[in-house]
From Swiss-Prot:
Keywords assigned by UniProt, alphabetized: DNA-binding, Repressor, Transcription, Transcription regulation
SUPFAM superfamilies per record: Homeodomain-like, Tetracyclin repressor-like, C-terminal domain
GO molecular-function terms, A-Z: DNA-binding transcription factor activity; transcription cis-regulatory region binding
Keyword Nucleotidyltransferase: no
Coiled-coil intervals: none
Entry's Gene Ontology BP terms: regulation of DNA-templated transcription
Protein's recorded name: Uncharacterized HTH-type transcriptional regulator YvaF
Pfam families, alphabetized: TetR_N
Residue ranges of DNA binding: 21-40
Annotated source species: Bacillus subtilis (strain 168)
Claim: DNA-binding is one of the keywords in the record: yes
Domain of life per record: Bacteria
HTH tetR-type domain location: 1-58
Amino acid sequence: MDKRILAETFRLIKQKGFSFTMNDLAAALGTSKRTLYAYYSSKDQLVEAVVEQFIAEMKQIERDIYENESLNVLEKVKQMLISLPQGMELLNMGLLNELKKYHYDAWLTLDAFIKEEWAIVLALLNECKQQKRIRNINPDLFVHMYIGSINQVYDPEYPLKHQFTTGEVLESIVDVLFNGITADEEADAT
């Protein structure tokens, strides 16, 4: 039942944001609020559990990419920059603001994860520099540029939202950040 509760809560968050009620959740599950409160003493505790499950899923994706021996270090960075944000698609700016406003402790947990999440990417970028797979750039600046780009994608007012899938946009962002905008011949001439 616990997994069903978390899955339905996640669905309701996507549908209604964090304004869903425990009544909404009980009705969607065909159970009573009493049953819900047997598993979670409050909506805050339930939201915290959803955030923790979400973080665990993102860490598993990251671990799978990091441990994939068929990928070189540069491919691992690219995969992380494309795959992880797709998993975080639920977290648009509106939902993050709601989470911060109504479930502050859960927001703190998620915020800490989002900030620390870049440690592995930074380590991989530094490894790429050492292996001369990328130019001598500032990895922190690269990550901030990337975060700024993906924040635009998750903005509800993002103008290209309906023209491209999130995956297509993320792949384009990573392509531009890794390869720039000049054609190979032009890059060779400069």
